[in-house]
Amino acid sequence: MNFQWLNESNLTKEGEKITIYAPAGTDFFCNDGTVSEEGVTPESLHNAPFYYTELSGDFVLTVKVSHDFKDTYDSSSLMVMEDLKNWAKSCFEKTDFGTHAAVSVVTKNGRSDDANGCNLSGNTAMASNLQSQ
């Protein structure tokens, strides 16, 4: 597969293992000005490292992720993108509740909606499945 970068960063490969280093303060999130229950307006960012390949047709992608969590919202993410205004990502994230959880973010027409799932411990597996309708 021919992989490319959007927002290039450092990457190491060891056998089948790929490690990508994300600088602090990077993310993919589109805020339309909505203020959270805590009174915070999340910043819109498109600056996280994104190492990708273009695919067509149906596919299933499964990965095992681990993370050295340091700060709130640090995550390992699996992302499917049509363009910068339409994409989805599943994350293994350090939440603002101090837990590690499965988190999903769906962005449609430039507006992101995120949802925290169950709390997780240790490493986790994530999968992305895209099928034609």
Language-model features: locations:
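Extracellular glycan-recognition regions
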Residues: 1-133
